[in-house]
């Protein structure tokens, strides 16, 4: 295959941008766009005040990446936040963007890649929203350099639980809310717009897949990369990996490049995670690299049959997306189709185990050993990360300067006779706590209330709740994430 150079930058970086005011080349938010935004804020505040006072507040969104399934709320109990989806402004010189809180990272990446820029951390799935990643969980292979998405937020405008719209930044009146907003999962308020930092990119990413038969050796390499930010003399812009099972581990190192001897493409018939075993190196466009996991929802498209070549050839390409699979899972959960099928076949019941957990690097080998012994689910995603700042975030129990590895595992495991649903999830939670780690709250949690608040800084949370939602208009974090209300 012929090589590719940076002269094709516009085509390689992706489609045209999606945004609110239509003229991305402007150097400031247009007055018309600002008027539309302010009108949308006023309308949302009125809508919020009109919601029934005794009903939980929920957002009317077309997609979700949460795995805490709840009954659908009545239409008159939801907030229409569609007006807050769009990129309001990109400033290439300052390397910043002003973005609606409901903007998906797919739209945001398309808007910024046009200028050779990207957000500092782009979570793995296209329909994750910027507001969702900042108030919840967001991590990716650039997290070894850039930490978590909320660390590159400059300021944000938030609709708080008491109905105010406030501007929160690192300094100023609402600095405490700014730092306490991450990991609050919409229980303190909703981000309506955010100003974020961007970083320059090159058109391609050169990836190298390095195999390890020993997890200790794999973690030794993680430590070396975290210390040096290089490997074999090359800079490490991205770092993640896969555990396929005991004795088979891979680290994938990504480095920006302005040339590509060849290009691989994993949005159609080819499957990215399978390529990790097949190739020692590869080249992708930067856009395709950002979404390499989305096409097959990492590897979770398997139950839908789309990894079968015969089915995949017939499956419309536009439906090879994580949000499509997530809707299929939600449909199955709503109507209990898989449960009915298992009962008719007299198959053993299965427990859904969908978690992302962060473990300190020095304890990762212990967690991996536990996981293969007790959970026995493969593959497992490995994503080394380190906070970008030297100051902790109050509701995010991660220490500055410390290297962690995010373990992502998503699937079902069989329940043995006498084991209740939640058995394996509770095992994971206990082991994570023992090893000094924490888990993301986007999926069902089983903690007791006292333990939960000990892990997630209940004192700081309750003080923020009293300051910004004294009437408890929004759900409590424990009620939302554990009780599933």
Model-derived features: positions:
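Noncatalytic alpha-helical scaffold of FAD-dependent oxidoreductases
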Residues: 2-485
């Amino acid at each position: 295959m012929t090589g590719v150079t940076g002269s094709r930058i516009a085509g390689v970086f992706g489609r045209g941008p999606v945004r609110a005011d239509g003229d991305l080349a402007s150097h400031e938010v247009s007055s018309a766009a600002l008027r539309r935004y302010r009108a949308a804020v006023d309308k949302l505040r009125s809508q919020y005040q009109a919601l029934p006072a005794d009903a939980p507040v929920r957002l009317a969104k077309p997609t979700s990446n949460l795995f805490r399934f709840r009954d659908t709320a009545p239409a008159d109990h939801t907030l229409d936040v569609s007006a807050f989806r769009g990129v309001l402004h990109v400033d290439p010189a300052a390397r910043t963007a002003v973005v609606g809180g409901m903007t998906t990272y797919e739209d945001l990446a398309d808007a910024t890649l046009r200028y050779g820029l990207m957000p500092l951390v782009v979570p793995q799935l296209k329909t994750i929203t910027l507001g969702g990643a900042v108030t919840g969980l967001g991590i990716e292979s650039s997290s070894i350099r850039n930490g978590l998405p909320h660390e590159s937020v400059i300021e944000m405008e938030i609709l708080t639980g008491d109905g105010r719209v406030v501007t929160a930044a690192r300094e100023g009146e609402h600095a405490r809310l700014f730092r306490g907003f991450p990991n609050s999962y919409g229980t303190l308020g909703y981000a309506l717009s955010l100003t974020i930092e961007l970083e320059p990119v090159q058109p391609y990413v050169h990836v190298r897949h390095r195999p390890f038969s020993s997890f200790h050796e794999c973690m030794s390499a993680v430590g070396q990369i975290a210390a040096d930010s290089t490997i074999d003399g090359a800079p490490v812009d991205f770092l993640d990996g896969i555990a396929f099972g005991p004795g088979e581990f891979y680290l994938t190192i990504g480095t920006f490049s302005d040339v590509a001897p060849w290009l691989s493409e994993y949005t159609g018939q080819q499957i990215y995670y399978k390529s990790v075993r097949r190739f020692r190196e590869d080249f992708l466009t930067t856009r395709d690299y950002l979404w390499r996991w989305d096409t097959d929802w990492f590897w979770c498209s398997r139950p839908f049959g789309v990894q079968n070549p015969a089915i995949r050839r017939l499956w419309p390409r536009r439906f090879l997306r994580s949000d499509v699979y997530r809707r299929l899972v939600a449909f199955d959960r709503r109507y209990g189709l898989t449960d009915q099928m298992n009962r008719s076949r007299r198959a053993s019941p299965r427990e859904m185990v969908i978690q992302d957990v962060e473990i300190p690097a020095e304890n990762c080998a212990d967690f991996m050993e536990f996981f293969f012994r007790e959970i026995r689910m493969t593959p497992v995603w490995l994503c080394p990360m380190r906070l970008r700042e030297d100051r902790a975030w109050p509701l995010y129990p991660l220490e500055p300067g410390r290297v962690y590895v995010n373990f992502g595992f998503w699937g079902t495991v069989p329940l043995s006779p006498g084991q209740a649903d939640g058995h394996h999830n509770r095992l994971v939670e206990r082991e994570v706590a023992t090893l000094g780690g924490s888990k993301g709250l986007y999926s069902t949690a089983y903690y007791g209330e006292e333990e939960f608040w000990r892990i997630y800084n209940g004192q700081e949370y309750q003080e923020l709740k009293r300051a910004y939602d004294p009437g408890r208009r929004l759900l409590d974090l424990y009620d939302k994430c554990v009780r599933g209300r």
